[in-house]
Swiss-Prot record:
PROSITE patterns: PCI. InterPro entries: 26S_Psome_Rpn12, CSN8_PSD8_EIF3K, PCI_dom. The gene is rpn12. Belongs to the proteasome subunit S14 family. GO terms for cellular component: chromatin; cytosol; nuclear periphery; nucleus; proteasome regulatory particle, lid subcomplex. Acts as a regulatory subunit of the 26S proteasome which is involved in the ATP-dependent degradation of ubiquitinated proteins. This is 26S proteasome regulatory subunit rpn12. Residues 65-237 form the PCI domain. It comes from the Eukaryota. Keywords: Proteasome. The keyword Cell wall biogenesis/degradation does not apply. GO terms for biological process: proteasome-mediated ubiquitin-dependent protein catabolic process.
Length: 270
């Protein structure tokens, strides 16, 4: 099979002409369908060609934030990652993106199934993309929110940007839900730090979405969200609620996040 059309796609990708990439991908998929190459074949040259097409499909889809298309291409390329083919230079990136996609969807069981299905387990240790996502998932599951935020802030993989924002939003919502149950009010500026938001405007937007009341620079949580059941069945009432200082230090904010993580773990146990 000629690589002429594939070279053209590679050139379009390098030029970041995403619309042209999509059109070229469509042409190539028609060719793949004609030759029954949507499933792995014993012809290594053809299988490698199909794998390349699907890999480009994954990367173009994430660049254009077309997640439905991304999921489709990811499911099509993964069966082509087997030992009989020469390893793909894009395998780590595509695998990492697929794992991050599953994490962003909170499909944790599928995340671990996908890990188990990776034919080259050494990828976990030598590939920076896969290793990074595995570490991120571990921190999310452990409630290590500071580590999650730090990893996302310092990540140098631009292809991960879309899904990282979703994961950070998941963490933020988890913190917000726990915060509602732990105390009845919190200074707006402290909430901004606690929720890893850039400024109070973002916090005000989140407050509106969650039905929080803001008065005089203080967020008041809904009463019905304040009761929290402990492991012994007792409820924390208003007298037991935590009181934040007017200006919490970074250490205080970090300690609160640890408490919220512990609170979340208690709820999972109960």
């Amino acid at each position: 099979m000629s690589t002429l059309d594939l070279n053209h796609l590679a050139d379009l990708y390098d030029r970041k002409d995403w619309n042209a990439c999509k059109k070229e991908l469509l042409k190539l998929k028609v060719e793949l369908a004609k030759q029954n190459l949507f499933v792995p074949t014993s012809d290594k040259e053809k299988a490698s060609f199909a794998r390349n097409v699907f890999e480009y499909g994954v990367l173009v889809s994430i660049q254009t934030c077309d997640i439905e298309s991304f999921a489709r291409y990811a499911s099509q390329v993964i069966p082509f990652y087997h030992d009989s083919l020469v390893p793909s230079s894009r395998m780590g990136l595509v695998t990492g993106l697929n794992l991050l996609y599953l994490l962003s969807e909170n499909r944790i069981a599928e995340f671990h199934t996908a890990l188990e299905s990776v034919p080259d387990k050494s990828l976990f240790e030598r590939d920076p993309y896969v290793e990074w996502v595995i570490s991120l998932e571990q921190n999310v599951m452990e409630g290590a929110f500071d580590k999650v935020a730090s990893m996302i802030r310092s990540c140098n993989f631009p292809e991960f940007s879309y899904f990282m924002k979703i994961v950070m939003s998941m963490v933020r919502n988890e913190i917000a839900t726990c915060a509602e149950k732990v105390y009845s009010e919190i200074p707006l500026s402290n909430a901004t730090s606690l929720l890893y938001l850039e400024n109070t405007k973002e916090t005000e937007k989140l407050a509106e979405e969650r039905g929080w009341d803001i008065r005089d620079g203080v967020i008041y949580f809904p009463k019905e969200a304040n009761a929290l059941e402990t492991e012994d069945g007792m409820l924390i009432d208003e007298e037991d609620e935590l009181e934040l200082p007017p200006t919490a230090s970074k250490h205080t904010i970090s300690s609160i996040r640890q408490l919220l993580s512990y609170t979340s773990e208690l709820e999972q146990i109960v």
